[in-house]
Amino acid sequence: MKTAEAQAPAVDAVIFKKEKRKRLLIKLIQQKYLYLMILPGCIYFLLFKYVPMWGIVIAFQDYQPFLGILGSEWVGLKHFIRLFTEPTFFLLLKNTLVLFALNLAIFFPVPILLALLLNEVRIALFKKFVQTLIYIPHFMSWVIVVSLSFVLLTVDGGLINELIVFFGGEKINFLLNEEWFRPLYILQVIWREAGWSTIIYLAAITAVDPQLYEAAKMDGAGRLRQMWHITLPAIKSVIVVLLILKIGDTLELGFEHVYLLLNATNREVAEIFDTYVYTAGLKQGQFSYSTAVGVFKAAVGLILVMLANRLAKKFGEEGIY
């Protein structure tokens, strides 16, 4: 009798597990089309994001292409020590952090402001037109964006310089003046990317209950107060998530954009880790060293995301995990 009583909980546990598996299987069958929809994305991340992580090990090797990963000599932290003792390390760090600060302080609030303003537009056709207009640049490559800037800003025949001369000023060499590199960089980022983030915020705003605005109007609240007390709090969680992800890109500003603007006259303010990795890795063939720089950037980004996420949760926000 005692043996049967002792075995009862174990039998119940087995039955519970079987029922749980059965429910899971039924749920998978019911949602099979949803899983099929996300399958291509999962395959993409597996092949192009996770499998290449195997290459991280060459950051700890003196990698030789002919010997391969398994045949190359292990050197430990040699390449990381070289990076931190490199004379240009602090220059690269400074330039990267300055551009990131500009992104965070100037670019990040722009889509929020645009979304708030577009939400107040009552003419639907005009609203859609503006949304399309600011979103189109996102589909242009940085090559096209920078090329358009060159056409507008060139000293001889550039529209901007022609206007400056027309109003009595002197021509400015925007492209070869290091003082203009950062303003040009951030203006191009705003023009190309602001529309994408604006769409995200607008989607979040659509979830706000219209009755809240009606109640605010009855209480005498104007549009500015409605924005401040209703719309902004409603999209606060989205802002926090995008801010955390943005902080994770502190050292990841994007190679292509900066490299297209980089030249001999502005290198002191334009050289960042991304362009440095390209020069060391592809131009000079220092594969292990350039990988070590990439690992350093990824580690910093991961730490900052974790810290930002913890800070967000400390202040009562959801965070990203």
Swiss-Prot record:
Induction of its expression: Up-regulated by growth on type I rhamnogalacturonan.
Topology term for the membrane: Multi-pass membrane protein
Gene Ontology biological process terms, A to Z: transmembrane transport
Protein origin, superkingdom: Bacteria
Subcellular location, principal: membrane
Pfam families: BPD_transp_1
Annotated GO CC locations: plasma membrane
Family matches, as InterPro entries: MetI-like, MetI-like_sf
Localisation: Cell membrane
Ranges for domain ABC transmembrane type-1: 1-144
Listed transmembrane segments: 21-41, 63-83, 123-143
Keywords attached to this entry: Cell membrane, Membrane, Sugar transport, Transmembrane, Transmembrane helix, Transport
Function: Involved in pectin degradation. Part of the ABC transporter complex YtcQP-YteP involved in the uptake of polygalacturonan and rhamnogalacturonan type I. Responsible for the translocation of the substrate across the membrane.
Subunit structure: The complex is probably composed of two ATP-binding proteins (MsmX), two transmembrane proteins (YtcP and YteP) and a solute-binding protein (YtcQ).
Family membership: Belongs to the binding-protein-dependent transport system permease family.
Listed name of the protein: Polygalacturonan/rhamnogalacturonan transport system permease protein YteP
Species the sequence originates in: Bacillus subtilis (strain 168)
Lineage: Bacteria, Bacillati, Bacillota, Bacilli, Bacillales
